[in-house]
Amino acid sequence: MNTQWDSPSLGRWSLVLLLLGLVMPLAIVAQVLSYQEAVLRAIDGINQRSSDANLYRLLDLDPRPTMDGDPDTPKPVSFTVKETVCPRTIQRSPEECDFREDGLVKWCVGTVTLNQAKDSFDISCDKDKRKVAQLGDVLQKAGEKIVRGLKNIGQRIKDFFGKLTPRTES
């Protein structure tokens, strides 16, 4: 007596289900974006929402922070974009556009998810405030050098007068 477990069609279906089980994780992995790809998608969204005349393109991507492996968890990002010569009205990838000379630079921060299916981001951009911070750093370092230089000069003057001995007449 043959049971339905002995039928050849059940064996084929079992094989198909087994293969599907092996292939599905690969399909899920293929939907995960790289950190840079997620940022580029966010820039596309920024360009779509922007009221500026020209497209923006990635200028600098800050180093990727240490992250967990969950592609659905929002990942912090920080990057700068610069205005290109391409008008927003044309259907062109910003990567194909040259940067505009003296184009506006914006500093963007927020979060992105690496799950391509969710494709979510929360980014806000502002004029590049890091330049002001960098200027502050330069001024602070210059001030520190000036203080060290003045201390050095003061020490030399002190040493000079310390070496002078009064002359005695004989």
Curated annotation (Swiss-Prot):
The leader peptide range reads 1-30
Q: How is it modified after translation?
A: Proteolytically cleaved by proteinase PRTN3 into antibacterial peptide LL-37. Proteolytically cleaved by cathepsin CTSG and neutrophil elastase ELANE. After secretion onto the skin surface, the CAMP gene product is processed by a serine protease-dependent mechanism into multiple novel antimicrobial peptides distinct from and shorter than cathelicidin LL-37. These peptides show enhanced antimicrobial action, acquiring the ability to kill skin pathogens such as S.aureus, E.coli and C.albicans. These peptides have lost the ability to stimulate CXCL8/IL8 release from keratinocytes. The peptides act synergistically, killing bacteria at lower concentrations when present together, and maintain activity at increased salt condition.
- Give the SUPFAM superfamilies listed for this entry: Cystatin/monellin (SSF54403)
Disulfide links within the chain: C86-C97, C108-C125
Biological process terms in GO annotation: antimicrobial humoral immune response mediated by antimicrobial peptide; defense response to Gram-negative bacterium; defense response to Gram-positive bacterium; innate immune response; neutrophil activation
UniProt-annotated location(s): Secreted; Vesicle
Propeptide stretches are 31-131
Tell me if Oxidoreductase is a UniProt keyword of this record. Answer: no
Among Gene3D superfamilies, the record links this protein to: 3.10.450.10
Pfam families, per the entry: CAP18_C (PF12153), Cathelicidins (PF00666)
Q: Which UniProt keywords apply?
A: Antibiotic, Antimicrobial, Cleavage on pair of basic residues, Disulfide bond, Immunity, Innate immunity, Secreted, Signal
Q: Which InterPro entries match?
A: Cathelicidin-like (IPR001894), Cathelicidin_CS (IPR018216), Cathlecidin_C (IPR022746), Cystatin_sf (IPR046350)
Asked whether the keyword Secreted is assigned, the reply is yes
Which protein family is it in? Belongs to the cathelicidin family.
Q: What is known of its domains?
A: The cathelin-like domain (CLD), which is the propeptide part, does not seem to exhibit auto-inhibitory function, as it does not inhibit the antibacterial activity of antibacterial peptide LL-37.
The job of this chain, per UniProt, is described as: Antimicrobial protein that is an integral component of the innate immune system. Binds to bacterial lipopolysaccharides (LPS). Acts via neutrophil N-formyl peptide receptors to enhance the release of CXCL2. Postsecretory processing generates multiple cathelicidin antimicrobial peptides with various lengths which act as a topical antimicrobial defense in sweat on skin. The unprocessed precursor form, cathelicidin antimicrobial peptide, inhibits the growth of Gram-negative E.coli and E.aerogenes with efficiencies comparable to that of the mature peptide LL-37 (in vitro).
Q: Which PANTHER family match?
A: CATHELICIDIN, CATHELICIDIN ANTIMICROBIAL PEPTIDE
In Swiss-Prot or TrEMBL terms, this protein is called: Cathelicidin antimicrobial peptide
Q: What is the lineage of its organism?
A: Eukaryota, Metazoa, Chordata, Craniata, Vertebrata
